[in-house]
Amino acid sequence: MKHVRRYFLLLAIICVTGVMLTRPQVRHLAGQASESLQSYYVSARADAVNEKGFTLSYNGTLLDIENMRMSSGMNLLIPLSDVVRYFGASVTVGEKGECFVQGQYLENAAFVDERMPERIMIDMTAAAPALGLEYRWDDGARAASLDVQQNQELPGYFDLRETRALNRVENQGTFGTCWAFASTAALETVLSGDETLDFSVDHMTMNSGFNIGPAEGGDYNMALAYLASWRGPVLEENDPYGDGMTDGSLTAVKHLQEARFLDERNLEQIKAMILRYGGVESSLYMSIENAWDSSEDYAPGTASYYYAGGEKPNHDVVIIGWDDDYSRENFSHAPENNGAFLCRNSWGEEFGDGGYFYVSYEDSNLGNNSVIYTRLDETDNYDGIYQSDLLGWVGTLGYKEPSAWFSNVYTAEADEILKAVSFYAVDDHTTWELYAVPDYSGMESLAQPVYLGSGYFENGGYYTVDIPEMLSLSAGSRFAVMVRITTENSERPIAIEYPASDLTAGADLSDGEGYISYDGNQWVSAETEYGCNLCLKAFTVNKESLYE
C-alpha cells in the first residue's frame, strides 16, 4: 500500500511452515515514544532471536510468514498483509495510525517497517487478546505460538449492519433463487475494509453448471462449486437480475479460496464466525412465501419468525447478528426461551424490518446446515487454476475407514510454479498430508512424491493450502498433486464429482485424470473404476511474473 487508509481486513487460516530472519527497523505510525527504554538485555535477546530465526504456530500448525520479526521489546510483529492471510479477523488502521482489532482500540499496535515503508506491521502480542488468541513465547525453543482461547466470551448482542455497510435487500420475486441471493449476500459481508460490491445472482444461477432452472431451488453446495471454480462472482451491473440473460464470458472479480461448514445447531460457533468473518448462510423452513403472506409462525409487527415443526428447510437466508435477550413474547407463538438470530432475507425491503427479521434460537432448522466464506482473495492471487470438478462436492469415496489417498494429474500450460492446492474436508477434524510429483510419467510416478506439508482442519469445508516451496513446472509437462486425508467418523473422506442425478448430469468425466489409493502405493483410476472426478485443484503462478 502506498498510502495508509482506513480499511477492514478479513483473514483466513493457512497451514504451512517457515523461518524468519533479521531484526526489524520500525517506527510508530502515531503516538509518543515509550517513556521507559527497553533494557539492553531484552534488545540483545531480540537481536539474537531474529538472527537465528524462530517459528510461529497457530493452534499447533506451523505458519510460513517470511517477514515476521521480534521488536526490541520482544513483541511479535507480523506484516499486516500476512495477518490478513492467516488469522481471520477484522483489523482497521486509520490515517493517523490508530489501530482497531475486532473493534477494540489498541494503542501503538501498528508500525511502519522503515526498511520497506509500504509495509505495515501489527504487534500480535498486543492484538492476540482482541482476536481471542493466547500468545506464548518459548525462549529455549525459539518458538512463538498463538492459540484460540477456550471459552471466549461472546457479546449478548451483535448486528453486522452496525460495523459495516451492507447492500440493500433485493427481491427474488417468483424465482427459486434464494440460495444464490443468500450466497452472494453472505459473500459480500466478508469483503475487506470498507469495500462494497454487489455480486450477480443471475450469473451464479445461470452459470452454475447444474441442470436447474431459475424457478427451481438450490443450495450452498452449488454456490460453492461455482465460486471455487472461479466462474464467479461477477458484478450485478454486468449481469443484472431477472432479465433471463447472462454473459458466460464474464470473469470473476474475486477468488474464493475457503469456506467452512459449521457444526449443526452450534449457536455459539455461528456467533463467533459472524463476529470474526461476516454473515453465515443457513437454511430454514418458511411457512410463508413472500412479504405479503401470513402464517401462525410469523409475527409481522415485530418481524419475528419461529417454526417448531418437522418440515425440511425450503429457504436460505444470511445470519448477520443475534440478540440473546430478544423476548420470546415477540413471536406469534412463544418458544421456551428468549434469544434470536437476526437474518437477512431476499424478499425485498417490504418484508420484515427493511428486509431483515428475527428467528428464534429454537427454530427447528436454522443453524442445522450453515456455511461461511472465510477466504476471499483478489484475482491476482494466482495465475492459473487446474481443475476437473466444476460441480464440486457431489458425493464421497473411500475405503470404509477414515483415511485414503487421492491424486489428480494435470498438464502445465506454461513455465509455472506450483503455489497451492485445494480440496474438501467432508467432516470435522480432518488431518492431511500434501505431496506433488512435478514430473509425472505414469502411475508408477505416484510412488515417489515430494512432501509439501501437513495440517489440520477443525471444520468441514473447502480449503486452499498454500505451498512455501518453489516447485517448478515446465510448459507441457505433466504433474500430479496428491493428498493423504484422514477425517474422523468418516468412511469415505474423499469428495468427488459425478453424474449422480439429473441435477449433476453435466459432470464431465473426460476432463480429469484422478487416482485413489488405500495405502499410497497401489492406485486405481477414479474415472475408470468409479466413474467420478476428484475434487482436488492446483493453483500456479507464471515464472515470468515472479520477476516483473
For every predicted segment, state its role.
Residues 149-419, 424-459, 492-498:
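Catalytic-core signature of thiol
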Residues 115-119, 138-145, 365-368, 475, ...:
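Extracellular interaction modules
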Residues 5-8, 18-156:
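Primary recognition of N-terminal secretory signal peptides and signal-anchoring hydrophobic helices
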Residues 1-2:
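N-terminal secretory signal peptides that target proteins for export/translocation
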Residues 71-73, 115-117, 275, 336, ...:
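Surface-exposed coil/turn segments at beta-strand junctions on protein surfaces, enriched
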Residues 484-548:
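Short, surface-exposed beta-strand/loop patches at domain edges
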Residues 268-274, 463-478:
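Short, surface-exposed tryptophan/glycine-enriched loops
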Residues 421, 477-483:
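Short beta-strand segments enriched for Tyr within beta-sheet-rich domains
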